Each structure stands twice: as C-alpha cells, then as structure tokens.
C-alpha cells in the first residue's frame, strides 16, 4: 500500500525543540458533538441538555473532552504519525478551557525527545501537543510517544513500497 507523498515524517526529520504547526484547523459542529456523545454513550447533561447547560458557569453546552482530544490528535497525524509503525503512549491529557460548538481547533506540537531504537531502523519521537481555539486560547494539552521508521526501514522506508 502506498502513502501520499509528504504524509508523515521519518525519524531523521524530527529534532528536539522543533515546533510543528498543524494545518488546517477543524471547526466543531453540533452534529460532531451529538454523534460523539452517542458513539461513546456519554449522556452527561452538560453536553446534551441545553437548558441544564445554560444554568452552569459555561452558559451553554460544552463539547465532550474526548472529542476535543480526538480532533486535536487527528490534526497532528499528517505531520507526526503519518508514517508511524505504532502509537506507543499517550499521557498527561489536560483540559485547560472548555470548547463549544462553532469553535475551530488548531494543534501545535513540540518535539520533546527523539531516540533511535535498538533495531536501528526506527525510533521513538515524543511530542507535546497544544490544542488552541480560534481565539488562541489553549483548551487542551497532551503528550505522546510514536514509533516511526527511519528512511532505511525495510518495509516503510520510502513510504511507496508495496506490502
């Protein structure tokens, strides 16, 4: 199976301290939140009951946090894990501010660590991702570790080899 040219990065293309701005963003719709609530069976009224939510400190329904995370990480795939062999770890998910329908999310990742594995043809990249809304407010941060190939990896190297 071939991958789109420019989709994902090899281990050699990551450097500690590198900041990757993921584009484009993604605007959250009411349908997104409703379907995600149905898929995950999350029935909390803060997410589904407009009358209840209007009486809270937020004054309106709040988008589910796991949906914010899913969109936030999805925005990073083309730049961070598009060539991944595996996602190894996700940690330290922090909600900093609520997200509402109509908000547009943008992700930005900082490379925290890059090291080659013992196999020599792959390595682990650690990143911290900040998810911001259209006002530039950080709504969520999380860290993850991704196993990515080097350019010399026998089956994933150039991204165009058939399996």
Task: Please report, for each region that a protein language model flagged, where it lies by residue.
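HotDog/MaoC-like acyl-thioester-processing domains
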Residues: 1-18, 95, 99-104, 108-163
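Hot-dog-fold acyl-thioester-processing enzymes
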Residues: 1-89, 151-163
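Conserved interaction-surface patches within small, structured recognition/assembly domains
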Residues: 91-93
């Amino acid at each position: 199976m071939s991958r789109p040219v420019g989709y994902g990065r090899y281990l050699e293309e990551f450097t500690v301290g590198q900041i990757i701005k993921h584009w484009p963003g993604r605007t959250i719709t009411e349908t997104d939140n409703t379907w995600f609530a149905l898929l995950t069976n999350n029935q909390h009224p803060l997410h589904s009951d407009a009358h209840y939510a209007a009486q809270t400190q937020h004054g309106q329904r709040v988008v589910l946090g796991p949906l914010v995370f899913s969109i936030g990480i999805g925005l990073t795939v083309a730049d961070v894990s598009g060539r991944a062999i595996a996602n190894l770890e996700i940690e330290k998910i922090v909600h900093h501010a609520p997200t509402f329908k109509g908000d547009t999310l943008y992700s930005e990742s900082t490379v925290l660590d890059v090291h080659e594995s013992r196999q020599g043809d792959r390595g682990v990249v650690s990143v911290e991702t900040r998810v911001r809304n259209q006002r530039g407010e950080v709504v969520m941060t999380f860290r993850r570790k991704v196993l990515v190939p080097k350019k010399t990896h026998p089956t994933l190297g150039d991204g165009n080899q058939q399996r």
